[in-house]
Amino acid sequence: LGDVYKRQPLMVGEGTEPVGRVCLGTVKGDMHDIGKNLVRIMMEGSGIEVFDLGVDTSAEQFVSTAVENHCGVIACSSLLTTTMEEMREVVKLVHERGLQDQIKVMVGGAPISQSFCDEIGADYYAEDAGAAAREAVKILKVQKAS
């Protein structure tokens, strides 16, 4: 059948400057991606360049990809209560590397709450894909202005 490729919809006009960059993924141990994919679509539709790491993403993968690609936000997704603690590792690594002023950590997913976000020291909680995109745009615009 020849080469198979995935066509991506044109979410933002060509030549348009992106609002900023986000590193997105589902945390280590979690193979669920429907929610993450919805977040990616909403973010791309809002003019954000998204680096989608897929599922089962380690803290090191999140942070190194964010640094290499100059992402202002790391957005972590989790569907399972057994994997939500991995988000704490992402926050911890961002702080260990002294990146907390350049990279903000956003968390979301079915078992995640504002209370959990506060407990692990993440910067932002998004209750759904639309909220994640809106919050990311705000964060990135502030970063771009400073």
Task: Label the model's feature ranges.
Residues L1-Y5:
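Short, small-residue-biased leader/transition segments that mark boundaries at the very start
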Residues K36-S46, F51-A122, A131, E135-V137:
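Cofactor-cradling patches in redox/metallo enzymes
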Residues Y125-A126:
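A structural signal for hydrophobic residues in beta-strands of small regulatory alpha/beta folds
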